[in-house]
Amino acid sequence: PISIYATILHGAFGTGRMLVTLHDIAILLCISLAVTPAFRMRFWNTGAEGQVLIGCLSTAVCMLVLGGKVPDGLLILIMAVSAILSGVIWGIIPAFFKAHWNTNETLFTLMMNYVAIQLVEYFLKVADKTGSNVVGPDLLTHGWFPEIFGVKYLLNILIVAIVCVAMHIYLRYSKHGYEIAVVGESENTAHYIGIDVKKVIIR
């Protein structure tokens, strides 16, 4: 068993693998940050997977349609905006139902994950006529983050670190963060002090 665990640790943190592991951790941390405001309100959003899939789908479309036609810097910006907007729209749907009809956000967002999975699978089949369900690097050659100091994933990790700090400041020191905290503690209290609870939930 010791040798097995040693192999696992070496595979994750050994030479050349540390940044890959940190990159994977950064992705998971970024997804966690996306649902942090909802959890702060004690609304159990289990739809992060669906939002990520829809965001990935929109960025892949941008790569396929605009790759090679616009500079990579502009393409990355378009992809980022597209991913954020598509993820927000996907998240607003259960938030709207929760705010207006008090639906169960856990089940709603969980079911939307399966809708997102089917949508991505459908578009994979449209893009890939071979039936392999893979749109590989040969098609997605533009819009990748550049290397910094020859390090492939450093920029990704730095961006997530900045987002993490920004989220902490937003939740702890902003008016919106205060409203989120109050709604999470007590919706009745939030109503009493004049907070628009429906607006906070959807936002």
Predicted features along the sequence, with ranges:
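Single transmembrane alpha-helix segments in multi-pass membrane proteins
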Residues: 3-66, 84, 88-92, 96-103
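Short, amphipathic, aromatic/basic-enriched membrane-interface segments that mark the entry/exit
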Residues: 16-20, 77-81, 148
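Residue-level recognition of membrane-helix boundary sites in multi-pass small-molecule transporters
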Residues: 48-51, 74, 105, 155, ...
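Short loop segments and helix-boundary regions at transmembrane helix junctions
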Residues: 39-47, 68-135, 170-175
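Transmembrane helix-bundle core of multi-pass membrane transporters
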Residues: 11-16, 105-173, 200-203
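Hydrophobic faces of alpha-helical transmembrane segments in multi-pass integral membrane proteins
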Residues: 26, 30-33, 54-58, 62, ...
